[in-house]
Amino acid sequence: MGSLCLQKLSAVERLFALESFELPEVPCSLSFHRHPEYKSITREANEWAFKCTRRDLSPEEKKSLLQWKVPMVTCLSTAHAPKENMVASAKFAWAIAFLDDPIDDNEVAATSYLDTVLSLCNGTASLAEVPDIVAYRACHDLMKDLRSLLQPELFKRTVSTVEGWARSISSDDLKQDYKLYRRNNIFILPLFYTLIGASFEDEDVESPDFVSAQNAMLDHIWMVNDIFSFRNEFYKKKLNNLPAVLLLTDPSVQTFQEAVNATCRMIQDKEEEFIYYRNILAANASRNGKDFLKFLDVLSCAIPANLAFHYASSRYHGMDNPLLAGGTFHGTWILDPKRTIIVSDPNRSNGAASNKLNQIQDLSKLI
């Protein structure tokens, strides 16, 4: 036990001195579907986000927000949803970004902040009763739209998901499993409920196979996020990401590079797990409603859509980074506080992985 502790102490010391690591290719065999009206959907959602700030944004400030590419996951998750649902889902993506940032930056007391968010979602508080910040304004305006757009059952399910996210964020249980914690605080399912705009039978979304498929999708999403957000976390002196957790807790992981490699393998395992359960659900399609199957298809698209977003968003790579032009990258990730720097070695390319990522290479730059 003492030897293991000393090994981990040495690993943590090296982590704090980290200057670079190797980012492997992250292959994805699933396909996303870009909505034909993605340009107007993106424009409307972005203009709404600008209005929520209640500021006369400078061109540079607008450019900074636009490079986040927040509506991207929505626009790549289905080609068939009604435009009003797409716009509402893209607004939801913006609301999530606005809600998430104050917590990440420790700008608010989490418990009172989340209580206010839930009061706005449930309609038990008015905007005039809460502090005037962008997250509350976005939440209030969005919920007003969703109440009129969604069926009552689906709106209730959406609010319930918000409540689950709030509980996970405000929990003071320091002994809970990190992977379960991250699965619970990935606040993305409401985007997909809004896209479909239809409710499902509880027995469909509570079946063991569907829960397993959904959990695999959520795990893939947060694991990708943990890899691509590492630079931001590192310079905030936070260890709230899977590679750091593996380095600290897994006896078989002795270096940060081993932790990154293990995380990327887990991402691939989660894709395969999702496909396995999705195929089981599709084989039983005759007993499920068409809306449920549309929802399952959206979850399938969400995996590559989220991956494309993480390659292309300035939230992870810094403003005006050439990497934001679209496509994937891999190689030596040189840590820098302002931007992602990748030094690629073309001789180390994995052809099979590259072929799987062709769709992201071709389309992510168009959003």
Residue ranges and their predicted role:
Residues 1-367:
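Alpha-helical, largely C-terminal catalytic domains
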